[in-house]
Regions:
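N-terminal alpha-helical interaction blocks
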Residues: 1-134
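Generic structural hydrophobic/aromatic packing signal, biased to beta-strands
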Residues: 11, 122, 147-150, 170, ...
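Hydrophobic transmembrane signal anchors and adjacent membrane-proximal interface regions, especially
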Residues: 48, 77-80, 104, 139-143, ...
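Short, charged low-complexity linear segments at domain edges
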Residues: 114-132, 139-167, 178-193
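Accessory, usually C-terminal, subdomains that scaffold auxiliary metal cofactors
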Residues: 157-236
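Hydrophobic, glycine-enriched assembly/anchoring segments
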Residues: 229-251
């Protein structure tokens, strides 16, 4: 577990430093003035497209190199046998991952350095876009199981004292949005939902019999303390292991 936390600590430092660089250069600054599209909200279409990230106009290749080196050094990812991939290949991989709406790193997939690093390169761009757009999105206008900013699937949830909704955390841009209290955000099935609380009662594992997916949740019904949800996602990795051992799917 300590090894996992150490890896993500280094990864986040790399990504956050690059995001700070993007912010300083005013990359994606135009999104501050971009209107929230009500038609997209009504149709369930995310506000940001891949082209909106304008990756061609920024030095992301340095970020890719740092992430790839970290993956090769600290994970089971193997260094590619041939020369470094061309920028066009990396962008194509990033586009495919963005369009698929899946988490930036897939679970249960072969350890492919190029694809894994290409996905992780997206994080600073998506997080920066989320910071510009999410505060201006009317939560009551969005009732979907995917993120209104980038279209990502949720990786975590928070159960509040309010009986009608919970908060979902995007697995890609760290955006947070409201979703109904009951029902699966992945397949939208309202029935066949079960949750298993941890011994402490602080967390719940929601599972959907219809699509076999699971979602970790933090029970905040009796607490109003501030919690960092991306950190909560990492600190509950034992729940992921237990769920997958039982055959439940992350996505």
């Amino acid at each position: 577990m300590d090894t996992l936390f150490h890896f993500y600590e280094q990864l986040f430092q790399i990504q956050f430093a690059f995001k700070a660089r993007l912010r300083e250069d005013r990359h994606l600054g135009y999104l501050e003035e971009k209107d929230i599209d009500p038609e997209r909200l009504a149709s369930g279409i995310p506000q940001v497209s891949f082209d909106d990230l304008r990756m061609e106009a920024s030095p992301w290749i340095d970020l890719y190199g740092d992430i790839a080196a970290l993956l090769i050094r600290d994970t089971e990812c193997l260094a590619p046998d041939n020369r470094e991939p061309q920028p066009e290949t990396i962008l194509a991989q990033a586009l495919e991952i963005f369009t698929s709406k899946v988490p930036l790193v897939g679970s249960g997939q072969p350890a492919d350095v190029t694809r894994t690093a290409s996905g992780l390169v997206l994080a600073p761009y998506l997080q920066l876009a989320c910071e510009h757009l999410m505060p201006r999105i009317t939560q009551s206008a969005w009732h979907r199981g995917h993120c209104p900013v980038c279209g990502g699937a949720p990786s975590f949830a928070v159960v509040h004292a309010e009986p009608d909704f919970r908060t979902l955390l995007c697995s890609r841009c760290n955006g947070e949005w409201r979703f109904r209290r009951m029902g699966c955000p992945f397949c939208m099935e309202r029935d066949h939902q079960t949750y298993y609380p941890t011994e402490s009662g602080d967390y719940r594992l929601y599972v959907c019999e219809a699509c076999r997916r699971y979602l970790k949740s933090l029970d905040m019904q009796e607490s109003d303390s501030e919690r960092c949800l991306p950190v909560e996602t990492l600190s509950t990795v034992s729940m992921d292991l237990a769920a997958r051992e039982k055959g439940w799917l992350f996505f």
